[in-house]
Regions:
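Extracellular beta-sheet/turn segments enriched in Thr/Pro/Gly and aliphatic residues
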Residues: 99-139, 145
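Sec-dependent N-terminal signal peptides
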Residues: 4-15
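Short, ordered, surface-exposed loop/turn motifs in non-cytosolic proteins
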Residues: 28, 37-54, 136-143
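Short, acidic Ser/Thr/Gly-rich low-complexity loop/linker segments typical of extracellular
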Residues: 56-69
Length: 174
């Protein structure tokens, strides 16, 4: 009887400790949009997906809601690549390095609204083979910080490719 009570107490204490432990996660959330290369009209992407690669291995696959919303949790201590895509759309990637996030960080929200566009015939968007943005933990200010120089260069290359795609679309319509 005494052994049963002790076992029950140990089980209860370990269960209580487990449920009250800090989550130590990043909460990724946002919306997916699509933009027309013809007229720049923007609307919610209704069939979008998010693939999450943890240390280069696929760990999460999420379909956005019909409002383009996605929301998921990822543990700290890893490098992630988030790949946003949709049917007949180009894919965009964002790299998150959460390896240096502090152990006492319990939960933090990371908001990304991502705009995708339809694939254009015979136009290669080579700039999208690499992540469009890279984030890493900055201990000085206590947040995930974007590498602005990298993002500027990637955005510049993508804008150049988008201009070519728009010209090709305009020529094809004539």
């Amino acid at each position: 009887m005494r052994a049963t009570i002790i076992t029950a107490i140990i089980f209860f204490i370990s269960l209580t400790g487990y449920t009250q432990a800090p989550t130590k996660v990043l909460n990724f959330k946002g919306r997916l949009f699509e933009i027309s290369l013809k007229n720049n009209a923007e609307k919610i992407l209704k069939t979008g997906t998010v693939k999450v690669f943890q240390d280069k291995s696929l760990c999460v696959f999420i379909e956005a809601t019909h409002f383009g919303v996605y929301d998921f949790l990822l543990p700290l201590g890893h490098r992630y690549t988030l790949e946003f895509s949709g049917e007949n759309m180009v894919s965009k990637k964002i790299e998150i390095d959460a390896r240096r996030c502090p152990e006492n960080l319990e939960k933090t929200a990371v908001d990304f609204d991502v705009v995708l566009f339809a694939k254009a015939a015979e136009i290669q968007f080579n700039s999208l083979n690499a992540p469009i943005a890279k984030y890493t933990w900055d201990p000085r200010i206590g947040i995930l910080l974007n590498d602005d120089d990298y993002s500027f260069d990637q955005t510049k290359a993508l804008k150049k490719e988008v201009r070519k795609a728009k010209k090709a679309i305009t020529l094809a319509e004539k």
